[in-house]
């Protein structure tokens, strides 16, 4: 693992998240105010109010001191499967799913006219960014996030041929200030991840830590809220908004570049603002306001019975925003957030759900991170649909969260999952 010297300028203020000055009181009042945090990955609530005193702002080394190396691409694990038709049928468990087609694909209805995307063969260079934040020494600390990153690093190296030299690992137990997951370091590492990416390269980002929500300012969210993640220095630097992560890691990618994202945090359903979200039947999801109204009503009744009147009000406001913005927000997202690249994300929960900090295989783990690794170790050659259902099956009966599959383009969910 190389220590980073990113040498990239910070995002411009127009990105909406950028590098914030220390948050002022009036800024805090504008954010959604959820109920007190539970022992989960934030429950949509920022990490504890105590300042992360263990971490001072990083002092960046001189140019060249922590450079990344450049290495010959490592070929992917061999497979005897040949490419098949894009329009594939759902394979059985004993059948190898078809590999992705190499010709350009059309987006179809709802996307810009004459817009095409390209699947990645994942035969080029591999790079990975792994971020795990336990928020050590803070009242709302987590236990499993650093373990998640350690396990994911080993899994990527042993199963998918990612070189240790091409991984950047940011965790809050490291002494090197460039390896601490501050907002500045995370944003620079995201820029490093996608820099100079070429067709058939395979990029990977894994975030395990606190997540939450903040009011949507650009009208691209069906529920009126943006998803956010919390760096270790969120108290002084602010959170990182999904719009910014999309602008940094999705928008610059060329056709045929693969970015696989695993977000094991609360309210992470659309953490990269990918417009195509799929059900466990492989069907593209559309806003269903009638169903969501029933779910929100049940949530409100439950909160009322528990005396949580703040949640009742938030639920009501949230549904009213969905009703007013849902269809137009989706249309805006499809028009502005599609990509010719091959970006796929598995998230720990829906936008409205929390994600569990759990104990599995003798150590604290994030539920999604654990299930993702376990199911691919047991059955490496799964389709996207099989993988989504396998992950959900691992969590079903243990946790209430429902992991999500989303993509930057229309996805044939019966194709072989590759990365």
From Swiss-Prot:
Keyword annotations: Apoptosis, Hydrolase, Protease, Thiol protease, Zymogen
Lyase listed as a keyword: no
Bias type Pro residues, positions: 33-50
EC class of the enzyme, as a word: hydrolase
This enzyme's EC code(s): 3.4.22.-
Disulfide-bonded cysteines: none
Active site: 210, 266
Low complexity compositional bias, start-end: 51-66
A single MF term (Gene Ontology): cysteine-type endopeptidase activity
Residue ranges, compositional bias (Polar residues): 82-93
Location of the region described as Disordered in the Swiss-Prot/TrEMBL record: 1-109
GO cellular component: cytoplasm
Record bears the keyword Protease: yes
Role: Involved in cell death (apoptosis).
Family (UniProt): Belongs to the peptidase C14B family.
Protein's recorded name: Metacaspase-1B
Organismal lineage: Eukaryota, Fungi, Dikarya, Ascomycota, Pezizomycotina
Gene assigned in the entry: casB
């Amino acid at each position: 693992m190389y220590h980073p010297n990113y040498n990239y300028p910070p995002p411009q203020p127009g990105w909406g998240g950028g590098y914030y000055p220390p948050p002022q009181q009036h800024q805090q009042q504008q954010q959604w105010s959820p109920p007190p945090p539970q022992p989960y990955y934030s429950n949509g609530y920022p990490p504890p109010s105590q300042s992360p005193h263990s971490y001072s702002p990083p002092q960046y080394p001189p140019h060249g001191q922590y450079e990344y190396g450049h290495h010959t691409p490592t070929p992917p694990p061999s497979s005897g499967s040949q490419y098949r038709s894009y329009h594939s049928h759902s394979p059985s468990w004993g059948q190898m799913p078809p590999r992705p087609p190499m010709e350009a694909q059309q987006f179809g209805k709802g996307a810009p006219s004459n817009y095409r995307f390209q699947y990645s063969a994942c035969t080029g260079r591999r790079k990975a960014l792994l971020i795990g934040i336990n928020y050590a020494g803070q009242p709302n600390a987590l236990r499993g996030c650093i373990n998640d990153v350690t396990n994911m690093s080993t899994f990527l190296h042993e199963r998918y041929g990612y070189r240790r030299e091409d991984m950047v690992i940011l965790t809050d137990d490291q002494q090197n200030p460039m390896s601490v997951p501050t907002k500045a370091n995370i944003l620079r590492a995201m820029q490093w991840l996608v820099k100079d990416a070429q067709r058939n390269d395979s990029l990977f980002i894994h975030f395990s830590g606190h997540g939450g929500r903040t009011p949507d300012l650009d009208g691209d969210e069906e529920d009126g809220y943006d998803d956010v993640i919390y760096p270790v220095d969120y108290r002084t630097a602010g959170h990182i908004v999904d719009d910014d992560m999309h602008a940094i890691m999705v928008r610059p990618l060329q056709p045929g570049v693969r970015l696989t994202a695993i977000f094991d945090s609360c309210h992470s359903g659309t953490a990269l603002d990918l417009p195509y979200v799929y059900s466990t039947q492989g069907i593209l999801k559309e806003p269903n306001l009638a169903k969501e109204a029933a779910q929100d009503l049940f949530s409100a009744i439950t909160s009322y019975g528990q005396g949580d009147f703040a949640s009742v009000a938030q639920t009501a406001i949230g549904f009213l925003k969905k009703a007013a913005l849902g269809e137009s927000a989706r249309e805006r997202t499809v028009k502005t957030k599609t990509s010719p690249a091959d970006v796929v994300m598995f998230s720990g929960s829906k936008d409205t759900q929390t994600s569990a900090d759990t104990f599995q295989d003798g150590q604290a783990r994030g539920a999604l991170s654990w299930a993702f690794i376990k199911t691919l170790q047991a059955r490496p050659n799964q389709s996207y649909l099989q993988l989504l259902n396998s992950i959900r099956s691992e969590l079903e009966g243990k946790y209430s969260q429902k992991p999500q599959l989303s993509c930057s383009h229309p996805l044939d969910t019966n194709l072989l999952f590759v990365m």
